[in-house]
């Protein structure tokens, strides 16, 4: 059974949380690289901060993914690798 926010014992308005969105090079977890990370930190319905960066996946972006996301190989080529991005995201 899936738990609800009521199960936390804290009203949702008092909970600080982050919503994270990833764009990747494909659909299978073992064969993909991250091309973009976006995050929003929220508390009580207020935005406390945002984070967004392109990520160099170290692999080619298939044309179908470029059509879907608008992210091209040229856009991610100068971007940092995921190893460099994660510490900044976790701050």
Language-model segments: residues:
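Conserved non-catalytic scaffold segment of RNase H-like nuclease domains
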Residues: 1-91
